[in-house]
């Protein structure tokens, strides 16, 4: 991945990396503009998200280059707020909104479509909003 990033040939490279503060994640944080960490609302999901954030921060990396995205979650506002509260002490930015676990998204993916290509306007808008939040965060960091 490092060669592709350094080549300058690409506007965007998406890397599905291992979780936790592994050696590969530590090397990625040095070369990426934004490290997006997907997670759910439960503590079982949040704990393994906070671990690499804290590990990277403890090694001197700023949380500014990281962002959490909630994906595959319920549409519960109280769970959303509780997850935000859980993440607050580690100081990692959170992309506004969430991508809920919906049948319409599963059906879209079964057809090879992106979440933003769901035929249903409500779910599609939720996915669009989160994607736009990632774009906005990346734009802020790279300008």
Feature map (PLM): residue ranges:
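Beta-strand-loop-alpha "switch" segments that mediate conformational coupling across diverse proteins
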Residues: 74-76, 84-116
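Inter-motif core of Ras-like GTPase G domains
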Residues: 22-42
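Structural beta-sheet core signal
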Residues: 15, 37, 68-70
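Switch II (G3) loop of P-loop NTPases
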Residues: 5-25
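Short histidine/acidic/glycine/proline-rich micro-motifs that form metal-
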Residues: 41-43, 71-76, 121
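Conserved C-terminal guanine-recognition region of P-loop GTPase G domains, centered on the G4
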Residues: 47-64
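NTP-binding/hydrolysis catalytic cores, primarily Walker-type P-loop NTPases
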Residues: 115-143
